[in-house]
Amino acid sequence: MAYAGKVVLHLRSTERQGLDSLIEDFMRDGVRFVGVVGPDCVDIEDVVDWICLGPCDGTREPYDMLTSSHDDESLEDAISFAERITGNYQGHAFGERVEVVTLG
């Protein structure tokens, strides 16, 4: 099953195992927005951005994904923020749900 166009990545720990492949899956499925909430969310947002940029050797074009981090905010706040994203980053279809993916 493909991921929704907008995802909130809910971190329960600072563990990053599997993050690279998860973001690759998001890109494969056409995810347009990822909001990150939980421990280390600011650093994890940066990692997501670097993965989307891709390798510097030109073997892949950068992937256009909007990201945000929600330090000191609740999961519900991050979901509410994601629900209000519109335009190019609104997801596959207007009004599409926000999917919460838990890591850690």
For the regions a language model picked out, list residue spans one by one.
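ATP-dependent carboxylate-amine ligase
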Residues: 1-104
